[in-house]
Curated annotation (Swiss-Prot):
Pfam families: Ndh2_N (PF19530), Proton_antipo_M (PF00361). HAMAP family: NDH1_NuoN_1. It is a multi-pass membrane protein. GO terms for cellular component: chloroplast thylakoid membrane. This is NAD(P)H-quinone oxidoreductase subunit 2 A, chloroplastic. It is found in: Plastid, Chloroplast thylakoid membrane. NDH shuttles electrons from NAD(P)H:plastoquinone, via FMN and iron-sulfur (Fe-S) centers, to quinones in the photosynthetic chain and possibly in a chloroplast respiratory chain. The immediate electron acceptor for the enzyme in this species is believed to be plastoquinone. Couples the redox reaction to proton translocation, and thus conserves the redox energy in a proton gradient. The lineage of its organism: Eukaryota, Viridiplantae, Streptophyta, Embryophyta, Tracheophyta. Belongs to the complex I subunit 2 family. Signal peptide: none annotated. One of its GO terms (molecular function) is quinone binding. The gene is ndhB1.
Length: 510
């Protein structure tokens, strides 16, 4: 009799929970419609994988890419709508969040074509790879719209877990296994530190978890200048630091870049920074409104260390992927300038514009590395010598992307940095901008060193890898070259038509 009553109570409770979830999706599901499209794509992938054989691989790529494109379309149709807070305050939809969601979807859409030939050559499981990429994208999108501490913690964990699995996807590679272990341990430690900071915020605000309610709670409890808030600020900055990977929280980055599969590195190098930047902007700007001077100082220190150490250490690298790892550390220092400037002086607009260009520059570079690695089997910078004599298109594409990363005019990277530094200068960040200019000049040195190797025609300098260089006969080659071409064009053309891009960013945000 007791068991029967308990069973009935369980059924009633389950029914109530299901009905509440259905009610939320029915009346507030429009706020997460792009995310729902990705979830539908994930379910469809699983269904097709369980009922088909390996001959249906093209369908897996088609479903993944189509769900991403439809999600982007749904996001664009919702552009410039009024801000919406849904799901009992857990999720917020506004122009600022949607821009970052668009950038994450764009990254994933460009990364999938980079993976086609690599997966075929390495014989990796295609379905699981695409599932992890789409799930990580989903976690990044939810993180951009997260409006409470619980969602801000769960969403990046969804992204991080998929990132750990992707970085160790080539299980037979010892370097990949080592990279995964370091990434997992560092990520777990950073998450625990982040939660520790959240607990101080939660307690100091009187038990509030929504970002704006935390501010009101701190005012009511008069704890906004307490030591607990300082502890929360330091803990959250450290936790977010491991996600953004500025110096000195960059220890995992070079090893993960070098050991992980190259398409995975391309994906992580941009999506993780976009999602973490969106999260850092909201967490620091809203709950720590009364401690703006303190977190500005912390971020200034991180930006200076990142720009100097990242570019100095990149000079000494012999591996292309390790060089790009240290270069990305320097790049995040530039992005932090936009976070510090904030709403005033178009700081956010300059940061978003530079991130858009960084996506095209970085993914274009990685597309070239994927092609060269598949055709030669090496990642050593020295082995790129003389590539222009064998494959002029690949060599020129890589050279353009590297020059754009360095910030040479009239490429997109130059105008992105110019706008970012100009906004920083107007906000009074003279030291940061000066260091940014000097380190940008320094970065041009090691990029030009690689370009010099690419263009060399001396036989004694050309390595056996380039002498035996052969184009791959696989048709899937076209998808990598298509993605590479799109990124190269995006890295050069926007420099000529900069004003419309800036106008769109400013009009959307303000």
């Amino acid at each position: 009799m007791i068991w029967h009553v308990q069973n009935e109570n369980f059924i009633l409770d389950s029914t109530r929970i299901f009905m509440k979830a259905f009610h939320l999706l029915l009346f507030q599901g429009s706020s997460i419609f792009p995310e729902c499209i990705l979830i539908f794509g994930l379910i469809l992938l699983l269904m097709i994988d369980s009922t088909s054989d390996q001959k249906d691989r093209p369908w897996f790529y088609f479903i993944s890419s189509t769900s991403l494109v439809i999600s982007i379309t749904a996001l664009l149709f919702r552009w410039r709508e009024e801000p919406i807070i849904s799901f009992s305050g857990n999720f917020q939809t506004n122009n600022f969040n949607e821009i970052f969601q668009f950038l994450i979807l764009l990254c994933s859409t460009l990364c999938i074509p980079l993976s086609v030939e690599y997966i075929e050559c390495t014989e990796m499981a295609i379905t699981e790879f695409l599932l992890f990429v789409l799930t990580a994208t989903l976690g990044g999108m939810f993180l951009c719209g997260a409006n409470d501490l619980i969602t801000i913690f769960v969403a990046p964990e969804c992204f991080s877990l998929c990132s750990y699995l992707l970085s160790g996807y080539t299980k037979r590679d010892l370097r990949s296994n080592e990279a995964t272990m370091k990434y997992l341990l560092m990520g777990g430690a950073s998450s625990s530190i982040l939660v520790h900071g959240f607990s101080w915020l939660y307690g100091s605000s009187g038990g509030e978890i929504e970002l704006q309610e935390i501010v009101n709670g701190l005012i009511n409890t008069q704890m906004y200048n307490s030591p607990g808030i300082s502890i929360a600020l330091i803990s959250i900055t450290v936790g977010l630091g491991f996600k953004l990977s500025p110096a000195p929280f960059h220890q995992w980055t070079p090893d993960v870049y070098e050991g992980s599969p190259t398409p995975v590195v391309a994906f992580l190098s941009v999506t993780s920074k976009v999602a973490a930047s969106a999260s850092a902007t909201r967490i620091l700007d809203i709950p720590f409104y009364f401690s703006s001077n303190e977190w500005h100082l912390l971020l200034e220190i991180l930006a200076i260390l990142s720009m100097i150490l990242g570019n100095l250490l990149a000079i000494t690298q012999t591996s292309m992927k390790r060089m790009l790892a240290y270069s990305s550390i320097g790049q995040i220092g530039y992005v932090i300038i936009g976070i510090i400037v904030g709403d005033s002086n178009d700081g956010y607009a300059s940061m978003i514009t530079y991130m858009l260009f960084y996506i095209s520059m970085n993914l274009g570079t990685f597309a070239c590395i994927v092609l060269f690695g598949l055709r030669t089997g090496t990642d050593n910078i020295r082995d790129y010598a003389g590539l222009y004599t064998k494959d002029p298109f690949l060599a020129l594409s890589l050279a353009l992307c590297l020059l754009s990363l360095g910030g040479l005019p009239p490429l997109a990277g130059f105008f992105g940095k110019l706008y970012l530094f100009w906004c920083g200068w107007q906000a009074g960040l003279y030291l940061l901008v000066s260091i940014g200019l000097l380190t940008s000049v320094l970065s041009i040195y090691y990029y030009l060193k690689i370009i010099k190797l690419l263009m060399t025609g001396r036989n004694q300098e050309i390595t056996p890898y380039v002498r035996n260089y052969r184009r791959s006969p696989l048709r899937s080659n076209n998808s990598i070259e298509l993605s590479m071409t799109v990124c190269v064009i995006a890295s050069t053309i926007p420099g000529i038509s900069m004003n419309p891009i800036l106008a769109i960013a400013q009009d959307t945000l303000f």
